[in-house]
Amino acid sequence: MKVFFILIIFSFTLATCQGHCIGSIPLPEMEDGEDVPLRTCVDTHDEKKHLIVSTWKTANSFSCECRQDGMWCCKEYVAVA
């Protein structure tokens, strides 16, 4: 039972260490007193603009996605065998 419990804890630790994601939630924009929907995201890695529902990879191994709720980037890992 002790070994099973240790394996469960190890698997949770491994799962949480595999992903490193960051997100940026855009500030609301106003135009004529009305909220303007988000049209683009600005990549904080290279300062380029990307359209909503687009995906791209950065030079420092992040896979990014621009969504209506903001920009989200996750670190890509290369498995060494």
Curated annotation (Swiss-Prot):
Signal peptide as annotated in the record: 1-19
Functional summary from the UniProt entry: Shows an slight inhibitory effect toward the metalloproteinase brevilysin H6, but does not inhibit the metalloproteinases thermolysin, HR1A and HR1B.
Localization in the cell: Secreted
Top-level division of the source organism's lineage: Eukaryota
Protein name (record): Small serum protein 4
Keyword Signal recorded: yes
Claim: Signal is one of the keywords in the record: yes
Disulfide bonds: C21-C74, C41-C66, C64-C73
Family as reported in the entry's similarity comment: Belongs to the beta-microseminoprotein family.
InterPro entries, sorted: PSP94
Main location class: secreted
GO cellular component entries: extracellular region
Keywords: Disulfide bond, Secreted, Signal
